[in-house]
Amino acid sequence: MRTGIGIDVHPFAEGRKLVIGGVEIPSAKGLDGHSDADVLLHAVSDALLGAAALGDIGLHFPNTSQEFKDIDSMILLKHVKKLLDKEGFRIVNIDAMLLLEAPKIASYINEMRKNIARCLGLELNAVSVKATTNEKLGYIGREEGAAAHAVCLIQVKP
């Protein structure tokens, strides 16, 4: 068994869609980044890559490459799954936490879980997504950005 942790942060920007966990959420601002800036999927991807000792998303999907400009992060997560499969790993579970002040996303969490589970070939009960605010503290509290943390457990396939 191996564990991995992933953390990602993106600032908010005008004129961008807000996509978290593969779900487009109505918002005046979206997250800024080279890809679609899906902070949740980036943290999950980093956790999985770390658990398998395969580096991080910056190594596999550099923000200097036009190939990944505005790419759907679900495509990146699918590629991460293929890398783990190739190395002989099976994903046991994922636990993730979103940190953002606004918008409120509780009504979207189950859809995020379903998207991640479907993408990774997991049962829904193997994917946990939670959200919290930063109690108005720091850049998250000032609604300047959002962050996500993810932990995963993987094992070598029998």
Curated annotation (Swiss-Prot):
Gene3D superfamilies: 2-C-methyl-D-erythritol 2,4-cyclodiphosphate synthase (3.30.1330.50). It is an enzyme of class 4 (lyase). GO terms for biological process: isopentenyl diphosphate biosynthetic process, methylerythritol 4-phosphate pathway; terpenoid biosynthetic process. This is 2-C-methyl-D-erythritol 2,4-cyclodiphosphate synthase. It comes from the Bacteria. Pathway: Isoprenoid biosynthesis; isopentenyl diphosphate biosynthesis via DXP pathway; isopentenyl diphosphate from 1-deoxy-D-xylulose 5-phosphate: step 4/6. Homotrimer. Belongs to the IspF family. SUPFAM superfamilies: IpsF-like (SSF69765). Pfam families: YgbB. GO terms for molecular function: 2-C-methyl-D-erythritol 2,4-cyclodiphosphate synthase activity; metal ion binding. Its EC number is 4.6.1.12. Keywords: Isoprene biosynthesis, Lyase, Metal-binding. 4-CDP-2-C-methyl-D-erythritol 2-phosphate binds at D8, V9, H10, H34, S35, D56, I57, G58, T132, T133, N134, E135, R142.
